[in-house]
């Protein structure tokens, strides 16, 4: 899978493709259905498949303080590579891009930039300044510009429309079984381990500080997790939140303690898979009270993880 950042990095060899456009936040089963159809059309036409995404996502640009928590960063839409996509075009969503009319978007990005032969979109897709572009607009543009358009049907699960919002709702309710069914895989967060204050080590429970490059996260609290490291899975306990007892920066942090693990994790990339919520994050009156709570969390995680430890 090739990642292209910005229209200015498109080359002549990138022209001629089938494409889809969207946030693809989390690449849930609805997205997967679109990508599966995209692959089919790519094979039929004998051209590469391309996913067009935006960073930041439009709602983060317009209302950053109230935009929903991201399930994954745009660069992690490289998950699409696991869905058989040949190329991801990541466009910076800025004032210039948001000002493009629907017609300009089609001309500059789809036709001049990508040379689109076929476009696959969701049934509720809108684009262009003030979101005036829709499926009907694309169909008319396709007739004039020489590309076809198809709208993917809504994917439902037990009568529920599969969407990123529904995934976030499931995560907020700590319903990881439902989240997994909506996503088609367990919910996970991947990131690199950074050096921290080493306070947890002083409290007797060393943790890996996993980098979170996002304003908001869809989870908060203490969780039973498993951590994938070089193909091996380790059970653990994770805290995700603002660390109210020891930090005052208001930023989200992900700290993971691996059960019975001995080794250096700094600068390594971990994938944290969430299984069960143990408790809410809370502010403690003292570090000693925090230590007691952490020990209880570890004991609870150990008891729950015992049947499947160290897979």
UniProtKB/Swiss-Prot annotation:
Substrates-to-products reaction catalysed: riboflavin + ATP = FMN + ADP + H(+); FMN + ATP + H(+) = FAD + diphosphate
EC number(s) on file: 2.7.1.26, 2.7.7.2
Entry keyword Lipoprotein: no
InterPro entries in the record: FAD_synthase, Riboflavin_kinase, Riboflavin_kinase_bac, Riboflavin_kinase_bac/euk, Riboflavin_kinase_dom_sf, Rossmann-like_a/b/a_fold
Keyword list, A-Z: ATP-binding, FAD, Flavoprotein, FMN, Kinase, Multifunctional enzyme, Nucleotide-binding, Nucleotidyltransferase, Transferase
Pathway in which this enzyme or protein is active: Cofactor biosynthesis; FAD biosynthesis; FAD from FMN: step 1/1; Cofactor biosynthesis; FMN biosynthesis; FMN from riboflavin (ATP route): step 1/1
Biological process according to GO: FAD biosynthetic process; FMN biosynthetic process; riboflavin biosynthetic process
CDD domains according to UniProt: FAD_synthetase_N
KW Transferase (keyword) present: yes
A single GO molecular function term of this UniProt record: FMN adenylyltransferase activity
Its biological purpose: Catalyzes the phosphorylation of riboflavin to FMN followed by the adenylation of FMN to FAD.
Family to which this protein belongs: Belongs to the RibF family.
Protein name stated in the entry: Bifunctional riboflavin kinase/FMN adenylyltransferase
Organism per entry: Pseudomonas fluorescens
Gene: ribF
């Amino acid at each position: 899978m090739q990642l292209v950042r910005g229209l200015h990095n498109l080359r002549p060899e990138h022209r001629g493709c089938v494409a889809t456009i969207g946030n693809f936040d989390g690449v849930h089963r609805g997205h997967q259905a679109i990508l599966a159809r995209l692959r089919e059309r790519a094979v039929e036409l004998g051209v590469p498949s391309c996913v067009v995404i935006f960073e930041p996502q439009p709602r983060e640009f317009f209302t950053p303080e109230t935009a929903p928590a991201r399930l994954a960063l745009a660069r992690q839409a490289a998950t699409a590579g696991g869905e058989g996509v040949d190329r991801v075009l990541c466009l910076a969503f800025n004032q210039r891009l948001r000002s493009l009319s629907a017609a300009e978007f089609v001309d500059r990005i789809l036709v001049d930039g990508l040379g689109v032969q076929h476009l696959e979109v969701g049934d509720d897709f809108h684009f262009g300044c003030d979101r005036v572009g829709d499926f009907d607009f694309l169909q008319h543009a396709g007739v004039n510009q020489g590309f076809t358009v198809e709208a993917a049907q809504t994917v439902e699960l037990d009568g529920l429309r599969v969407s990123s919002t529904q995934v976030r709702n499931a995560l907020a309710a700590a319903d990881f079984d439902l989240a997994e069914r909506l996503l088609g895989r367990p919910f996970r967060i991947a990131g690199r381990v950074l050096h921290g204050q080493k306070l947890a080590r002083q409290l007797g429970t060393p943790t890996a500080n996993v980098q979170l490059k996002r304003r908001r996260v869809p989870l908060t609290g203490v969780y039973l997790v498993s951590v994938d490291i070089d193909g091996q899975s380790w059970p653990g306990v994770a805290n995700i939140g603002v660390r109210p007892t020891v930090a005052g920066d208001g930023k989200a942090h992900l700290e993971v303690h691996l059960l019975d693990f001995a080794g250096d994790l700094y600068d390594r990339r971990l994938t944290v898979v969430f299984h069960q919520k143990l408790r809410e994050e809370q502010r403690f009156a003292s570090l000693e009270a925090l230590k007691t709570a952490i020990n209880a969390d570890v004991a609870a995680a150990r008891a729950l993880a015992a049947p499947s430890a160290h897979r």
